A protein has these predicted regions:
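N-terminal juxtamembrane cytosolic/stromal segments of multi-pass membrane proteins
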Residues: 1-36, 271-280
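Alpha-helical transmembrane segments of multi-pass membrane proteins
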Residues: 29-57, 83, 91, 100
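Short amphipathic alpha-helical segments, especially helix-boundary/capping motifs
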Residues: 26, 56, 67-69, 180-185
Length: 280
């Protein structure tokens, strides 16, 4: 699968069906092009999935975003500069056959999102936090040491990762989506709780694809671009009003469609030119 399909979306679709831990050997310009096309798809799918909130409300449920009074410029910096890097480290740095990367992702993800243990046992909050940090540090190190000892016995971690890359990929996307449930208040049956974060779930699949197929920093850039485009709407609303946000929404619909269609149009023009040259 190291060979690239004609259209980036076809490559992404094949990867979704059968994830393979193979890095594309394309040049930087081609990789940036793939990134832009895949993020365009992500934007469109995220906007479509966001419409599920309307379906939920029609069905008698309720999903409301948690409102936090934050300066829009600070929110912009956090969403565009800080969140992409930190979230990619936590959720997708470990999507590579590297035990150090696995340790960093395991430790940071567990400290931040895993259940906090023995809360009633410690009266001092500092001791409680310190115990949990130490516990998850030891647990993460233990998992990585297990794979290290297996390597010493001839069972390479790279082979294990390549075999189970699909589990790494899909589990990572799910773990990325679940913490975003805290961004909403909802009244839903337990089996529908995942619906409000389906855009984040698809985002996890998109960023995971970029990380595995292109590299870690391409995943960061894709995440940054995605957050930038969506956060700009909030900033425009704050400074220019709802009309500016509506205009930006139209831009977010039209531009990704054009980007997704461009490779097909270029390929068609190339085929027409080839036929003309052959007929001369």
């Amino acid at each position: 699968m190291n060979a690239f399909h004609t259209h980036p979306i076809l490559d992404f679709w094949c990867f979704l069906r059968r994830p393979v831990a193979e890095r594309l050997s394309e040049g930087m310009a081609k990789k940036v092009f793939i990134l832009i096309v895949v993020i365009s798809l992500n934007i469109l799918i995220s906007m479509i999935l966001s419409l599920l909130d309307i379906v939920i409300e029609v069905g008698g449920g309720a999903v409301e975003p948690v409102e936090i009074d934050v300066n829009p410029l600070l929110s912009f910096v956090g969403a565009v500069l800080i969140a992409p890097l930190t979230e990619e480290i936590v959720f997708r740095l470990g999507l590579a056959p590297n035990l150090w990367f696995l340790f960093i992702s395991l430790f940071l993800a567990s400290v931040q999102y895993a259940p906090k243990l023995l809360g009633d046992f410690f009266s001092d909050n500092g001791m409680f936090v310190g115990f949990n940090v130490l516990f998850y540090l030891v647990l993460s190190a233990g998992i990585c040491l297990f794979f290290w000892f297996r390597e010493r016995r001839g069972h390479r971690y790279v082979d294990f990762f390549n075999r189970y890359v699909g589990a790494y990929y899909y589990l990572g996307a799910l773990l990325f989506a679940l913490p975003h449930l805290g961004n909403f208040t909802y009244q839903l049956p337990w089996w529908l709780v995942i619906l409000p974060v389906l855009p984040q779930l698809f985002g996890g699949l998109t960023f995971g694809y970029l990380r595995i197929r292109l590299g870690f920093w391409y995943g960061v850039m894709g995440h940054l671009l995605h957050n930038l485009l969506f956060t700009l709407g909030d900033v425009l609303t704050y400074f220019l009003g709802a009309t500016a946000n509506f205009v930006w929404l139209i831009v977010l619909i039209i531009v990704p469609i054009v980007v997704l269609m461009a490779p097909f149009l270029v390929e068609r023009q190339r085929q027409v030119a080839s036929r003309v040259d052959a007929g001369r």
